[in-house]
């Protein structure tokens, strides 16, 4: 530990103590908040089922930065490199298309054995795993419908895929001792004016009920459902809208997933957290950065990321909110994208933990909105960076931008050798 870091740390402790904040307690609380990193940033959502196939479902990974992971071993190595540069507890979020098998496996036939290597790797790295059925980039999703498909046999295929995915998820939770959150997102929708908006939603409702009909141990598996405003090719109608899934999660008491990019550009999910928490048992967050649409840019330490973190901390939702990331940028170094986005999420959580929330609540309750605004703004200038640097030091990770040197060295030694 450098003298400069020690001095900054001691000063920060004093400054925060003056406003009633115990920074040591803040760091202890930060270690209670794992962030689930998404595997698909590492290979542009290609997966291993058909890595040369097209990405469909109204989503896009833009760019062609060299060094993309081509197989599970490369992806795990890249994840390890990124995780070494991110302090504190982490999880990994997998999609079904990241299975490993010597022979082709139909998506409705995936089994825990196809993810055994991921589980062993997670054990070795002390990680929890989360999961997602992959209802896109497949011949049977090519017409834009999956769980709401009008063809009974195609719809059943996707139902069976989601049911098989739940068993994989439960396997993760049982093996790793921490529940796997399995999120269902489907691309179903229509490009142009839709006459019958009801029938697809009726089919989706029945399909989801069949998907979750098998009782699984909640200590191992948590169901979540995710809405979306629109996707490319589904601009006019999305079957799984916000209202649909809010109603579903409320009536079935599943978790609800709120994705930062899946709403109108003037909406923010930070404002939805407290409302949804009144009705659903748990929330899954997909923290992202939409630029004019659901572009899935790398997460910044911006106002909305901070507001999301503050909502979690202010309302003590540590045990009810699961924090996941969802972005994929193929135009920059993919490992750097993971590191930047995940560190920013953790920085936002730390800043939220360093807020004098109790004092701010008193001012708000008393109607002293002048002091509330003044304190909120003054707090931004307190030396939270010194606390962050100490947190990084204790977790043996770089405190500042020196992590980029490690990424560059890895790029030169490893990524540049890939075809």
Swiss-Prot record:
Domain of life: Bacteria
Catalytic function, reaction form: L-rhamnopyranose = L-rhamnulose
Pfam families (alphabetical): RhaA
Chief localisation class: cytoplasm
Keyword annotations of the record: Cytoplasm, Isomerase, Manganese, Metal-binding, Rhamnose metabolism
The protein's annotated pathway: Carbohydrate degradation; L-rhamnose degradation; glycerone phosphate from L-rhamnose: step 1/3
Binding site for Mn(2+): 262, 294, 296
Keyword Secreted set for record: no
A GO molecular function held by the record: L-rhamnose isomerase activity
SUPFAM superfamilies on file: Xylose isomerase-like
Signal peptide feature range: none
InterPro entries reported for this sequence: L-rhamnose_isomerase, Rhamnose_isomerase, Xyl_isomerase-like_sf
Location(s) in or outside the cell: Cytoplasm
GO biological process per UniProt: L-lyxose metabolic process; rhamnose catabolic process
Cofactor(s) needed: Mn(2+)
Keyword Magnesium found: no
Co-factor binding details: Binds 1 Mn(2+) ion per subunit.
EC nos: 5.3.1.14
GO cellular component, one term: cytoplasm
Sections of the chain in a coiled coil: none
HAMAP family given in the database record: RhaA (MF_00541)
Subunit structure and binding partners: Homotetramer.
Protein purpose: Catalyzes the interconversion of L-rhamnose and L-rhamnulose.
PANTHER family from the UniProt entry: L-RHAMNOSE ISOMERASE
Membership in a protein family: Belongs to the rhamnose isomerase family.
Protein name: L-rhamnose isomerase
Gene name for this UniProt entry: rhaA
């Amino acid at each position: 530990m450098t003298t400069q870091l020690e001095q900054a740390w001691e000063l920060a402790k004093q400054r925060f103590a003056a406003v009633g904040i115990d920074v040591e307690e803040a760091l202890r609380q930060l270690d209670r908040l794992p962030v689930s990193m998404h595997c698909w940033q590492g290979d542009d959502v290609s997966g291993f089922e058909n890595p040369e196939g097209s990405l469909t479902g109204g989503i896009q990974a833009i760019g062609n930065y060299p060094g993309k992971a081509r197989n599970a071993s490369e992806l795990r190595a890249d994840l390890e490199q990124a995780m070494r540069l991110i302090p504190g507890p982490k999880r990994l979020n997998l999609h079904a298309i990241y299975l490993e098998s010597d022979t082709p496996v139909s998506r409705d036939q995936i089994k825990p054995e196809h993810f055994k290597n991921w589980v062993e790797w997670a054990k070795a790295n002390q990680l929890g795993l989360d999961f997602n059925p992959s209802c896109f980039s497949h011949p049977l999703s090519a017409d834009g419908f999956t769980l709401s498909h009008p063809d009974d046999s195609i719809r059943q295929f996707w139902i069976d895929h989601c049911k098989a995915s739940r068993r994989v998820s439960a396997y993760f939770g049982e093996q790793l001792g921490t529940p796997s959150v399995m999120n269902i997102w489907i691309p179903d929708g229509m490009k142009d004016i839709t006459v019958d908006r009801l029938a697809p939603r009726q089919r989706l409702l029945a399909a989801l009920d069949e998907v979750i009909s098998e009782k699984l141990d909640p200590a191992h598996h948590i169901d979540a459902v995710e809405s979306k405003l629109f996707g490319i090719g589904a601009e006019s109608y999305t079957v799984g809208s916000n209202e649909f899934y809010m109603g579903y999660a409320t009536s079935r008491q599943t978790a609800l997933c709120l994705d930062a990019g899946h709403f109108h550009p003037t909406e923010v999910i930070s404002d939805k957290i407290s409302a949804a928490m009144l009705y659903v048992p748990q929330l899954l967050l997909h923290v992202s950065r939409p630029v004019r649409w659901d572009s899935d840019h790398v997460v910044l330490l911006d106002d909305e990321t901070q507001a999301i973190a503050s909502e979690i901390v202010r309302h003590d939702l540590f045990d009810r909110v699961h924090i996941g990331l969802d972005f994929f940028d193929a135009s920059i170094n993919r490992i750097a994208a993971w590191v930047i986005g995940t560190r920013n999420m953790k920085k936002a959580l730390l800043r939220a933990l360093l807020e004098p929330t109790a004092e701010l609540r008193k001012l708000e309750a008393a109607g002293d909105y002048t002091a509330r605004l003044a304190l909120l703004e003054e707090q931004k200038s307190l030396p939270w960076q010194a606390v962050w640097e100490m947190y990084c030091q204790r977790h043996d990770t770089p405190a500042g931008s020196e992590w980029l040197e490690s990424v560059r060295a890895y790029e030169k030694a490893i990524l540049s050798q890939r075809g």
